[in-house]
């Protein structure tokens, strides 16, 4: 049951970039399908001196008649030094027997990465696909942290839209996000809709699952601005 296989390939160019840190250094989200919470995303930020570690955990479980029909788990740790992305370690466990151990690090002006396709030598300016970092919307290519591959992306800015979180109305920037499909993907990469607060924090994203045509929404649950 591939309900969320591509749900979170979830959350700089070489120029310096500083993205927002949430209150209490944590952003948490509910993952919702058919009006039911089926999982969570938690991103924590550990900022010490010039080093920032961003840890993201995705935990999804779908039950049908009290029986687990689908599970997905992913974790990743990004390391940034002086506002530059230099390292990542990750793990993704899919609903079938697929699992990937992801690594990447800047070495000698090359980003050496490994994942589904083995070892890759990439431009050191590559960014990880973490929707929290709005800077990814300016890129042409990103590093997929779920499978350890490169995807080309295309982003379209839409009209700002008012959304509601925790009974608060927020005027958010809205974008469409598309990425190329890899030959080993089980299905097409879905089109994502992303909403960001004016301070650039990620508030919400959604997509339509290609297999069952159901909408999956991920929305911030600890927003208190």
Where are these regions (language model features)?
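Alpha-helical interaction segments
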Residues: 1, 19, 121-122, 185
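Acidic/charged, solvent-exposed loop-and-adjacent secondary-structure segments enriched in E/D, K/R, S/T
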Residues: 107-127
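Alpha-helical transmembrane spans
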Residues: 125, 130-135
């Amino acid at each position: 049951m591939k309900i969320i296989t591509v749900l979170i390939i979830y959350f700089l160019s070489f120029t310096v970039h500083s993205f927002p840190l949430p209150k209490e250094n944590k952003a948490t989200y509910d993952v919702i399908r058919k009006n039911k919470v089926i999982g969570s995303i938690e991103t924590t930020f550990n900022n010490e001196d010039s080093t920032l570690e961003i840890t993201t955990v995705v935990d999804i479980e779908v039950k049908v008649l009290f029986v687990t029909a689908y599970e997905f788990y992913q974790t990743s740790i990004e390391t940034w030094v002086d506002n530059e992305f230099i390292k990542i370690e990750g793990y993704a466990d899919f609903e079938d027997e697929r699992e990937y151990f992801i690594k990447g690090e800047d070495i000698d002006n090359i980003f050496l990465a490994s994942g589904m396709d083995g070892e890759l030598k990439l431009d050191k300016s590559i960014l990880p696909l973490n929707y929290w970092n709005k800077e990814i919307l300016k890129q042409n290519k990103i590093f997929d942290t779920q499978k350890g591959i490169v995807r080309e992306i295309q982003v379209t800015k839409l009209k700002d839209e008012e959304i509601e979180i925790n009974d608060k109305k927020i005027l958010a920037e809205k974008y469409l996000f598309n990425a190329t499909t890899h030959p080993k993907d089980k299905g097409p990469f879905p089109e994502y809709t992303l909403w960001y607060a004016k301070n650039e924090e990620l508030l919400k994203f959604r997509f339509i699952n290609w297999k069952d045509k159901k909408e999956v929404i991920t929305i911030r649950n600890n927003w208190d601005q």
